[in-house]
Regions:
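C-terminal catalytic/motor cores of large multi-domain enzyme assemblies
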Residues: 1-311
Length: 311
């Protein structure tokens, strides 16, 4: 054993990149998710040929800047399903030592969604009040996020969110956690670098309507990750994703893909599948609680003309 411990591999380091503020937050939240939450995952695979045909019709005759994206339509489909399944649009507060818990459902559907910004950065943004938005509103909201991101210092935005979360933890008596986070983020060689002096003053002089703020990045009521928008030729499914506490559910969406369809007359044709992955916190929900969501998704794909009413 001692000989094994003394063995060293000759490896050439290509790159060593220490965590920035965005990766720090992701690492912290996902680690907490797997530590605290009993995940249950189910998939729903509606046949999407007619749905995609109607989606194409939706954009006929529209100028490029007016076209509705598939991402916007999928977000609307999910939002309508969440209206019928409010149990998924909720937060949980559970104290394991006392075995006490409470699940709080919300009327507002605020979707946390990872987005690939024009800068190439991945950022999870909070799409507020989706329950009131039409397809056109959702399209405009997504475009506005990209517009404001161009004027935003993402490290500063993430630091503002992290600091606010840390101070909330202090208010709840989490002294050790608060001190540890402050030491980890603001001391040492690899501390988080934020704006200061003139740069900071000039940055915060940009109107909030023209840049992203902590309001845009704060915790939503549920997470939706459209992985298919990142890899449109992906021939696979999202097998699992993290629930971000205190949320009780997360939804992953793949890319439309070819699949064999067995017809009633015994013939087989090529169709399209769009896979929805639904992950829920078993402390808060059982399978029966998410069935209304799954049924709503199925209904929309069976009768896709409804999406024309959502414009």
């Amino acid at each position: 054993m001692k000989g094994v411990l003394r063995m060293k591999q000759s490896l050439t380091v290509r790159k060593a990149e220490h965590f920035g503020i965005n990766r720090k937050i992701i690492a912290n939240m996902t680690a907490q998710s797997w530590h605290d939450i009993p995940h249950v995952v189910v998939t729903n695979e509606p046949e999407a040929s007619d749905f995609l045909k109607v989606f194409k019709e939706l954009n006929e005759g529209r100028a490029k800047q007016d076209k509705i994206t598939l991402n916007a339509v999928i977000l609307k489909v999910i939002t309508e399903a969440l209206k019928k399944c409010p149990a998924m649009n909720a937060h949980i507060n559970f104290k394991p030592r006392l075995v006490r818990g409470c699940v709080t459902e919300f009327d507002e559907i605020n979707i946390s969604m990872p987005m690939l910004l024009d800068s190439g950065e991945m950022m999870t943004v909070n799409l507020h009040n989706m329950q009131d938005k039409s397809l056109t509103d959702i399209r405009d909201t997504l475009a506005d996020v990209q517009r404001r991101a161009k004027n935003s210092n993402m490290s500063q935005v993430m630091y503002d969110v992290s600091l606010n979360d840390t101070l909330q933890g202090l208010a709840k008596g989490k002294l050790i956690q608060t001190v540890s986070r402050l030491i980890g983020s603001k001391t040492g060689k690899y501390r988080v670098k934020t704006l200061s002096g003139k740069q900071k003053k000039e940055y915060y002089g940009i109107p909030e309507r023209d840049r992203l703020t902590k309001h845009d990045i704060e915790q939503g009521t549920i997470t939706v990750s459209n992985l298919g928008s990142l890899y449109k030729d992906w021939d696979g499914i999202c097998a699992l994703l993290e629930i971000i506490p205190p949320q009780v559910a997360a939804i992953g969406v793949g890319a439309p893909r070819d699949t064999a369809i067995a017809n009633p007359d015994g013939t087989v044709t090529v169709g399209k599948k769009l896979v929805f992955t639904v992950v829920f916190d078993h402390r808060a929900l059982d399978m029966g609680d998410v069935v209304p969501f799954l049924k709503s998704i199925d209904e929309t794909f069976k009768h896709p003309e409804v999406i024309k009413e959502w414009i």
